[in-house]
Design a protein with these regions (language model features):
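A hydrophobic alpha-helical transmembrane-helix feature that marks the membrane cores
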Residues: 1-270
Length: 270
């Protein structure tokens, strides 16, 4: 049985985190304040920092829960993981994730003097969302597919980013209609999945239907990657001073997270 949370990978993420932090400090900040210089690069650096933070937090959570036991490397059943985390804290983490993402969404994008506050709520968001997705890395039914799901997610992200740059005029000239279409599609999928969960959970078709909607979610958030890339290009032109880079990186992060989660689900339920 393969082991989970190899410590050599943890050290690799620590090293990557430090390198990205060093580059970010030189690229995005001047006199400890964020600048508009290298705007696009800085957003991607914050995205990379977010991903490294999720990995580091997940390793730390695993160490806190199982560091002194043989279960540190072992994949476990989902109920064992949730019992170790504690259901109240897990639910609290889900609630805090939503609260913090709302706070980030309503923070100013530019001319934002609350640099420390912006980074604190962003870092707290990354911690609490790490708690909610940590079980996917430890669960005996999904852990073996994490690398594959990450690879597929990375390919989708790169391809859809390239797709925007190939057809940038298509997106930039139709931002409102594309954005509305994506929003309506997302709302419809959420409603349909809630109906499936509430009324058809015990049906023999529940899992098959959820697989279908998972493919739709992957397609939807793949388009979101291109749309958010277009948004970033617009924000770069609008930037005047003190950009809120944590806020701008969150959209890409959520795109990646949704694509990864659904890809992992589909891989683990073949």
């Amino acid at each position: 049985m393969e082991k989970t949370f190899d410590k050599s990978i943890f050290y690799l993420f620590i090293f990557a985190f430090i390198i990205i932090l060093f580059i970010l400090n030189n690229s995005a900040f001047n006199d400890n304040l964020p600048t508009c210089n290298n705007f696009v690069v800085n957003v991607y650096l914050y995205l990379a920092l977010s991903i490294c933070s999720i990995a580091i937090f997940s390793y730390l959570i695993n160490y806190v829960l199982f560091g002194k036991s043989r279960q540190y490397y072992r994949p476990l059943e989902l109920y064992e993981i949730l019992n170790s985390i504690g259901s109240p804290f897990y639910i609290f983490s889900i609630i805090m994730t939503f609260v913090l993402i709302i706070l980030i969404a309503f923070s100013n994008g530019f001319d934002n003097n609350n640099v420390g506050y912006n980074h604190v709520i962003w870092f707290l968001f990354l911690f609490f969302i790490s708690v909610t997705i940590y079980p996917k890395f430890k669960d005996i039914t999904t852990y073996n597919y994490v690398d594959n799901a990450l690879l597929i997610t990375s390919i989708i992200f790169i391809v859809m980013t390239y797709f925007y740059y190939m057809f940038s005029d298509l997106f930039l000239n139709n931002m409102s209609s594309i954005g509305m279409g994506l929003l309506v599609s997302l709302i419809v999928i959420v409603i349909v999945e809630l109906i499936n969960l509430l009324f058809f959970k015990r049906s023999q078709y529940f899992l098959s239907f959820f697989k279908i909607t998972s493919y739709l979610v992957i397609i939807l958030f793949s388009v979101f990657v291109s749309y958010d890339t277009a948004e970033m290009a617009i924000r770069e032109k609008e930037c005047t001073s003190l950009p809120n880079y944590p806020k701008f990186s969150i959209d890409f992060f959520m795109d990646i997270l949704n694509i990864f989660s659904r890809t992992l689900f589909l891989k683990s339920t073949k």
